[in-house]
């Protein structure tokens, strides 16, 4: 898509980085947002190698003023916003009875409120461009569990938020969908396995090998696989898809 601009949050690593690199094939410019500038610069190098422009913005989207600042800089640099992919948001994986109010608020601030504020700030530009928004949730939205209750709770809220935005988007010409990945092998997944392993009397290597069996899947997903789904949702081929919740988890969720 010539002269088209996408904002990708969480672009410094994992699914966010993979999505930004994938979108460099479809968009003329990418706005890359995360807190770690050095890692963002690495993503930017891959984006520019694919012949797309890259604007690096190191920002903490958990801060209320960050969203409007990101949108202002994107519009100043490129003049338009055609797609917004809200991927940022690490939620603490702590037991329901051990997680503090501050930890709950921290998880909500970035993943839920950060995505909400950025979508609202970008909405006028998205409306003008008849653009698309994707909010990344997770399949734990469908089966919250006590050992990591905040993850499932906040992911479920993301799904509801995307539905609300899509309702307004029908009138405004903005499509909004959410994506629910399952166990994808990222740095965050490796950290989770380091926590999960001793709880199940395993080494990290054993836990890494055994987790797919425990989850009822054949293997872990790859960030690039989720990136392909994200790219489809902001492509012309998905223009009539809005208000949808797309799960990509290797079959972990068995329910209808």
Located regions from the model:
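Conserved glycine-rich cofactor-binding loop
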Residues: 12-13
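Conserved glycine-rich Rossmann-like NAD(P)H-binding loop of the short-chain dehydrogenase/reductase
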Residues: 27-42
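C-terminal substrate-recognition "lid" of short-chain dehydrogenase/reductases
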Residues: 78, 219-248, 253-254
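Substrate-binding pocket helix/loop in short-chain dehydrogenase/reductase
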Residues: 95-96, 103-108, 211
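Alpha-helical segment proximal to the catalytic Tyr-Lys
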Residues: 124, 167-168, 239
